[in-house]
Amino acid sequence: LKLTMRQIAKLSKKYKIVITHGNGPQVGNLLLQQESCDAVPKMPLEIIGAMTQGQIGYMIESSLDTAFMELGENDQQHFVTLITYVVVDENDPGFQNPTKPIGPFYTEAEAEGLSYTLTKTDKGLRRVVASPKPLAIVEHREIKKLIEMDFIVICCGGGGIPVIRK
């Protein structure tokens, strides 16, 4: 991450930057943490998605801050992480056929008895969740404004948190 953020810090001198990221492993890990403890209320997937957007955004911001300090420009560049929603169609086939891999890889033996929807990968079996096609970014105006203000914007983590608007 540090090497990537150094390159992005250099690119930001000439370009406006928007950073997106995946969150599958982090979402899966948080789900595993929740499932391993009955004393703590379980959070729904959209809350876990928001948690990981913040978690990964923090990691990116921290690495960017270090990169800009190394370049001697720590007070000149601004960046922000934005928890981001995306509008999806309630009839999207992604709800019936989950395809987004999250969490760790399982062997056949480890997967036995799991109640998750799993898919085969080159590294083993992996849990999958719904990943409907994003139709629009809810915070598109805010993202545009932040870009116009020369912020590096970190948004749409994990593809965004899906919402249905009627």
Predicted regions and their residues:
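N-terminal glycine-/serine-/threonine-rich phosphate-binding loop
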Residues: 1-20, 30-35, 145-148
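Short beta-strand segments at enzyme active-site cores
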Residues: 16-29, 78-83, 153-156
